[in-house]
């Protein structure tokens, strides 16, 4: 179930303040965050945000297509290495 429309999209205040500060000064630097739950706003476009995946910070460059999605969608938390291969030939 999605978020109620009357509430509007969510973004952590500390992250929004950092983005607004960079937009005012015109700087482009990597912003490190643990806030995977924050929605990407149009003000984020062009910035690189390092999102924590539980082990390291994954740099995510924000483009126009990402607006409306959550930051956590672009930093996967699980690494899939494939299922164990069948060794039918070696068992015989």
Swiss-Prot record:
Disulfide bonds: none
Keywords, ordered alphabetically: Ribonucleoprotein, Ribosomal protein, RNA-binding, rRNA-binding
PROSITE patterns: RIBOSOMAL_S19
This protein's record includes keyword Plastid: no
Transmembrane segments: none
GO molecular function: rRNA binding; structural constituent of ribosome
A matching Pfam family: Ribosomal_S19
GO biological process per UniProt: ribosomal small subunit assembly; translation
Annotated GO CC locations: cytoplasm; small ribosomal subunit
Entry superkingdom: Bacteria
Function: Protein S19 forms a complex with S13 that binds strongly to the 16S ribosomal RNA.
Family: Belongs to the universal ribosomal protein uS19 family.
PANTHER family with a match to the protein in the record: RIBOSOMAL PROTEIN S19P FAMILY MEMBER, SMALL RIBOSOMAL SUBUNIT PROTEIN US19M
Protein name: Small ribosomal subunit protein uS19
Native species: Anoxybacillus flavithermus (strain DSM 21510 / WK1)
